Amino acid sequence: MNECKGMESHLTEFSGLVSKNCIENTTVPHTAYILQVHKNPDQVNRFIDQIISEEQADVFVHIDKKTHNELCRKILNNPNVEVLDENIDVKWGDISQVDATILLLKKVLDKQKSYDFVCLRSGQDLLVKNGFRDFLLNNKNKIFMTATHIERSNSDVAFQNISWPKVARKQYNVFHPFRVFRRIIMRLYGWGFNIFPNPYKLPEEFSLYHGSSWFCIPLNIARYIIDFLERNEWYYDAFKNALCPDEWFFQTIIMNSEYKSQVVNNNLIYLRWDQTFKNRNHPITFTLEDINSIESSDQYFARKFDQNFDNSVIEYFINRIKI
C-alpha cells in the first residue's frame, strides 16, 4: 500500500450483476447523491445537472469549511439540491473526511424519503457512461464499494493500530521531513515496534478491510451505519487518530455485518493514481488524451476532472452522457 493510495477496483465485468437488458422495468430508481465539494462550483453544477435529470435524484452537498462561504451561494439553485449549512474542515489523512460523510448520511436519513441508493461522490467526478439509472434499477440491494481484507499481521494495519501524530496526518506534496517521519513509523511498525500505539484498538473478532472512500449503498445500509455508530461509540474512537481512516472506516463496518454478502467489490468509479513523487497520493487529473482509457474502463463515473486544468474533457462527457 502506497501511503494513502486507495485500492480502487477497475473491474470491467460485474460478476453476478444484472444487465439492464435482462429486465424491463419502467420504474425510476430514487437516488440520494452525497457530494463532498471544495472548489470549482461551475464544474460541480455541471455534474449535478448530469445526475438529477428527470428529477429522479436528490443531491446533498457538503462544502469544505475552508471554502464554504465562497461557494455555498454558487451551487445550483434547484429543489432537488440541498447545500448543508453545517460544514467541516476536511483534511487529508484525517478523521474529518469520515465526519463529512457521516454528516451527509445523517442528512439523507433525516429526509425520511425512500431512496433506493445513496451514492458518495466528489465535486470533481463526472458521469462518463450512459445507463446508470437502469443499472441501479436492476441491481437494487447491492453494495458498491471496494473492500480488501487486510490481515492483522499485515504491516498496513499500522494505518489503524497507530495513534498517528497530527503532523503525520498532513499532506506533503514535496519532500518534507514529516513525510520521511511517516515512513519511519511505518517501517518500525513492520519490525514490531509501535511507538505510538492506538489505545482504542478494534476487538480481535473484527476483521479489517481497506478500500476507496467512495461508495454507492442502499438506503438501509446507510441507516445501518449510523445506527451502528450510535450504539458503538468505541468504533469511532478507534479511528479518530488513524491515518487515512476514510479508507477503512465504512468498509470495516459493512464487511463485519450481515450485509457482507451484498458487497460488489467495485465503487463504479474510474481513476488512475499519479506515479510522481510529488503527487503519488493523488489520482491524476484527466485530459482529452485520457478519453479512450476512461471509456474503455466501463465504469459509470470517473475522477478527477478540473475545469482549470482541461475543460475540454469535461465538455466531451457533459455533451454525451446522461443519467
Where would I find each of the regions flagged by the language model?
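ER/Golgi luminal nucleotide-sugar-dependent glycosyltransferases, focusing on the catalytic module
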Residues: 3-323
